[in-house]
Amino acid sequence: MECDLSIDVPSLTSADRPPTICIVNADSGRLAGRVALVTGASRGIGLAVARRLVAEGARVGLTARHPEALAEAVAALGGPAHAVAVAGRADDAGHRRAAVDAVTEAFGPVDVLVNNVGINPAYGPLVELDLAAARKILDVNLVGTLGWVQQVAAGMDERGGCVVNVSSIAGRTPSPGIAFYGVSKAAVDHLTACLAVELAPKVRVNAVAPAVVKTRFAAALHEGREEEVTRAYPLGRLGLPRDVAGAVAFLASDDAAWITGQTLVLDGGVSLAGRPAG
């Protein structure tokens, strides 16, 4: 069985489309004056992260595959004074260069990179996994993550900056059906630690590892099973994109100035219950 679980989808539905954000901290928020770049930001976790960073005072560049969805996201974030978007594929080095150049031209050098984009185009046992799909997963989730860091690292090393990678609890707990996705995210956790050592002291690098968050990415895995899956969570609910966004904003801010190389698990307590997250 094969399914496309890419974070990015062609467009926002009316139910998913957020209201235009109320920017209350543009001059005094924790990220006032900073420039952020968020990948996979047309919807779901990526859009929630972008929305939170703008609310904290940052100006934000968005990347994803679909121009129409990105245009809607920019409008929801308050328009071009607060956000710009560049459409393209995360595994395309040319797109990564173009996105960083566009954000730099619009707002200035990137201070905060959020590597959110991730895919899982195949579902099923590892022994049946198509190796072309495995390579694609690694190209986007791992190699692409490193590629984005390479695009901004030199500038950050001069000025300071931070990177937040969006990993997954699947990288810590074997998850049947999406095991290779989990392998890619375990590698992202280790990449995070390695980059933190190499890029210190000017650049902090951390990750967040959510369990099941209510997005289309997760819905494709748990269709018809949400109530069953939710029962495993001591906090009594699945995660929401804003839960991840709050953690990312914290790690991107000076409140986390002495934190680097860490992966912050966001799982509603499910790992304490000793059961699979999904």
What are these regions (language model features)?
Residues 96, 146, 237-266, 271:
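C-terminal substrate-recognition "lid" of short-chain dehydrogenase/reductases
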Residues 22-27, 120-123, 173, 249, ...:
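Short C-terminal tail/terminal secondary-structure segment
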Residues 154, 196-201, 257:
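Alpha-helical segment proximal to the catalytic Tyr-Lys
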